[in-house]
């Protein structure tokens, strides 16, 4: 036991762990938007407005996007980042940065008990020190149990007290089924405000495809006729049962 304690005391961060934790374990989505590295996003204005309305609140200002896989939850975050870059958000949100947090990377390589908690706490401390940052956690239901071991805390228990503090904001995304795991934890559930992201209609999907049409044409070096967009939405909705619009319609066009 003494040798293990000595090893832990002598432990130093690897080279990749030195430096700002947000740069190591996160991705600045607003920076990618500013550099033009994000795909253009279309539609979902209602969900975006609802999310911004929650973000500008004084309390209970942590939205979580709840919807089936492929309906465009991450696209809403990218659209939000683009709006920030173009100053098309309420003044309270101007100049904010959206940083996507990679929980898997925080967990990866944790060799000692308490190392995950140390990494995660470093990230939270940096966010609290920079109130302009909004963190985004995809598959946020995974925070329950992430990093937990006998005698240690999981990410949810570390995050819960921080969510109620001013100067810290978090956006989550998860599926309808997995959100039930958050609902089972009353303390965590009341800190998040769910936003239902429904599957778009065929007409809404066609509008999204029209927006993506120039980038798809440029990538494949072809001309995509308007009828093909309508047909991909109709046929994918009719014959592909295990996936959701607009993702499956985009894949039909991309694979054709």
Language model features: what each stretch is:
Residues 218-227, 231-256:
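C-terminal helical "lid" subdomain and adjoining coupling/linker elements of P-loop NTPases
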Residues 108, 125, 197, 221, ...:
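Amphipathic alpha-helical interaction elements
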Residues 193-206, 219-229:
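Conserved AAA+ ATPase "SRH/arginine-finger" region at the nucleotide-binding site
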Residues 1-107, 117-130, 136-142, 148, ...:
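Histone-fold recognition with a strong bias for associated Lys/Arg-rich disordered tails
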Residues 96, 104-115, 200-205, 232:
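Flexible, glycine-rich beta-alpha linker
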């Amino acid at each position: 036991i003494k040798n293990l304690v000595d090893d832990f005391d002598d432990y130093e961060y690897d080279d990749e762990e030195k430096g700002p934790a947000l740069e190591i374990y996160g991705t600045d989505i607003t920076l990618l938007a500013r550099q033009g590295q994000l795909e253009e996003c279309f539609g979902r204005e209602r969900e975006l407005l609802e999310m911004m309305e929650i973000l500008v609140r004084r309390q209970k200002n942590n939205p979580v996007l709840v919807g089936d896989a492929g309906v465009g939850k991450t696209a809403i975050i990218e659209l939000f980042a683009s709006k920030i870059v173009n100053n098309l958000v309420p003044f309270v949100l101007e100049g904010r940065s959206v940083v996507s947090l990679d929980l898997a990377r925080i967990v990866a390589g944790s060799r000692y008990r308490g190392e995950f908690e140390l990494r995660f706490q470093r990230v939270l401390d940096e966010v609290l020190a920079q109130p302009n940052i909004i963190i985004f956690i995809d598959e946020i239901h995974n925070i329950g149990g992430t990093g937990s071991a006998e005698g240690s805390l999981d990410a949810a228990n570390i995050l819960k007290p921080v969510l109620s503090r001013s100067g810290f904001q978090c956006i989550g995304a998860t599926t309808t089924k997995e959100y039930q795991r958050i609902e089972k934890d009353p303390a965590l559930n009341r800190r998040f405000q769910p936003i239902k992201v429904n599957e778009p209609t065929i007409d809404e999907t066609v509008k999204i495809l029209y927006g993506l049409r120039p980038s798809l044409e440029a990538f494949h070096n072809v001309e995509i006729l308007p009828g093909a967009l309508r047909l991909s939405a109709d046929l994918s909705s009719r014959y592909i049962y295990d996936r959701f619009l607009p993702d499956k319609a985009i894949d039909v066009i991309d694979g054709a």
